[in-house]
Amino acid sequence: MRLNVEIMKIQYASDIHLELSDNSRFIKSEPFEVTGDVLVFAGDTGYLRDRTLPNLRFWKWASANYREVLLVPGNHEFYGNGDVLAYGDSWSREILPNVHYYQNKVVRIDNVDFILSTLWSHIRPEDEYFVHRGMNDFRQILYNGRRFTPADFNAEHEKCLDFIKQSVAESTAERIVVVTHHL
């Protein structure tokens, strides 16, 4: 006896940087080959502060070609003086009815829990000086109205990691997919 079980196909992408005109033009001329039911973007798709981001034709195309489009914010979503805390610790933002950004949220599709979080990296104390000087994040991103610091980065890492661990422990889904931007 064979069971007729439908398997959800997940298509994954990251760092497409639609805020860059070359990338945006490329996506228009060479759309993704649709190979999944759900499209997951694990960060760095565009600047959240950019008012044109929700109006890109790409989202209409993605909405029409995928059952759901799940986006996790990466660090670049907050470039241009975006504030990491502007939306709170856990939030979602709709672009279209089936296209959403999620930060520290669980989305259940069928019997699969998608655990979605930026999961900022942990910066070791001995690396703080060089990371702070070398990464644009600390010049481009705000944190509660002031410049983002390595201590803020680590605080966000802990919040995200705690959220992921708790969500995995509490899930009752048959399957779990954890989506993060950082490791």
Listing of model-derived features with the role each one plays in the protein:
Residues 115-177, 182:
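Active-site-proximal loop/helix segment associated with metal-binding centers of metalloenzymes
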Residues 9, 68, 98-100, 113:
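Conserved beta-strand segments of alpha/beta enzyme cores
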Residues 1-71, 78-86, 143-147:
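N-terminal active-site segment of His-dependent metallophosphoesterases
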Residues 3-11, 106-116:
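Beta-strand-turn-beta hairpins that frame and shape the catalytic cleft
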Residues 83-102:
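Glycine/small-residue-rich loop that forms an oxyanion/phosphate-binding "nest" at active or ligand-binding sites
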Residues 10, 37-38, 112-113, 175-177:
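Structural motif
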Residues 31-35, 100-108:
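Short acidic low-complexity segments
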Residues 17-19, 46, 75-77, 106, ...:
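Catalytic metal-binding/acid-base residues of hydrolase active sites
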